[in-house]
């Protein structure tokens, strides 16, 4: 199990086998052509409960909107944190 915390304070855990997934690599490869596909990464990493928690973590308190910038930053932090550990 890989556990960590993003710069914004979101605590996560990912089962290691989820990172050794060819289909995840395919989605990550497509990000170069279409950065908005980052949304497709989440189901490969997290279950529904953790996805919901990440969205709530990035929900703007005033507007109620889940910020794309916050979600993107947290997802990138998760990959950077994992890369640093390997």
Tell me the role of every PLM-derived stretch.
Residues 7-11, 15-86:
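Short, surface-exposed, charged amphipathic helix/loop patches that serve as local interaction elements
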Residues 1-7:
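Short acidic, Pro/Gly- and aromatic-enriched capping/linker segments at domain boundaries
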């Amino acid at each position: 199990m890989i556990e960590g915390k993003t710069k914004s304070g979101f605590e996560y855990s990912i089962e290691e086998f989820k990172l050794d997934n060819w289909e995840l690599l395919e989605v990550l490869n497509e990000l170069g052509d279409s950065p908005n596909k980052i949304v497709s990464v989440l189901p490969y990493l997290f279950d529904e409960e953790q996805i919901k928690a990440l969205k709530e973590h990035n929900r703007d308190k005033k507007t109620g909107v889940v910020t794309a910038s916050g979600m993107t930053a947290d997802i990138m932090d998760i990959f950077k944190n994992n890369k640093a550990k390997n």
